[in-house]
Amino acid sequence: MMNNVRKLKHNYKIMNNANIKIALDFLLENSKIGKSDAIEIISFITKIEYSEVLFSQEKVLNKKQFKKIIKISKKLAKGKPLAYILGYKIFRTHKILVNKNTLIPRMETELIVDYVNEFINSQNEKISVLDLCCGSGCIGISIAIENKDKMENVTFSDISKKALNITSKNIENNNLVNWTKVVKSDFLNSIIKQQNKFNILVCNPPYIDFNDVDVDKMTKKYEPKLALFAKDNGLFFYKEAIKNIDKFMDITKNILIVFEIGWKQEKELDVFLKQELGLKYKWKFEKDYFNNLRYLILTK
């Protein structure tokens, strides 16, 4: 207890003459975060561009700014994700708003956009995309921004109205309103009823089994369970989508489906795909940055 009191007094003492270098050191010492996150916090509080923070280390912070740093540090020390504290996450190079109703975009999910971009560049016609279980909309928004000239439309769908509110804000912030659509749907139910057909499906569905003991404790504590867990060993949503491909994909043309999957799910999914699709479609499994099998990619 005495150590905490001393530390607190020290924090308020350095508040009077703290510059950005001191603030960075304070965050690294007290918050269990890396340097890039510490720079992001300083950028957020001071409004200095991220790329300029390290060139501005002698700039003195005012008391209000340093109090904010202490407050953020305390939240981080308790395990609260930085993205939820700041209210956004940089995904690829795009600023994506998030809150407790959306999953935090992960680095490994970024590769989905690369697979889609490669496919789009090989097509001659304009493309219609469905971002299913969209959460914050980070995947569909990145695809839309990076392929504006080739987009027919992008539809964002999720069961959570609160998540879709964040999606809508991200769409507005990136000037994508005119050629995007937001649909509240219990997975594919409303999508199929509307009878729209798509060239591309991207989907990072709930895929963690309810009994999985490997789930990160802080992920389980802070992120929405609705977006994390699925029945049938976490495979329910993949199977539902695959069984209904012809009801929402434009199978008269080239199609691309990219799922993010759990690293232990490849074998079960492969067996199911062989039983359900036979030779009608081609599929492969690809690894993420960390050498884990993370993507199911399906084409016609």
UniProtKB/Swiss-Prot annotation:
UniProt GO MF annotations: nucleic acid binding; protein-(glutamine-N5) methyltransferase activity; protein-glutamine N-methyltransferase activity
Binding site for S-adenosyl-L-methionine: D158, F187, N204
BP GO terms, sorted: methylation
Catalytic activity: L-glutaminyl-[peptide chain release factor] + S-adenosyl-L-methionine = N(5)-methyl-L-glutaminyl-[peptide chain release factor] + S-adenosyl-L-homocysteine + H(+)
Function recorded in the entry: Methylates the class 1 translation termination release factors RF1/PrfA and RF2/PrfB on the glutamine residue of the universally conserved GGQ motif.
Enzyme Commission code: 2.1.1.297
First-tier enzyme category under EC: transferase
Keywords associated with the record: Methyltransferase, S-adenosyl-L-methionine, Transferase
Disulphide bond pairs: none
Protein name per its UniProtKB record: Release factor glutamine methyltransferase
Binding site for substrate: N204, P205, P206, Y207
NCBIfam families found in the cross-reference section: hemK_fam, RF_mod_PrmC
Family, as annotated: Belongs to the protein N5-glutamine methyltransferase family. PrmC subfamily.
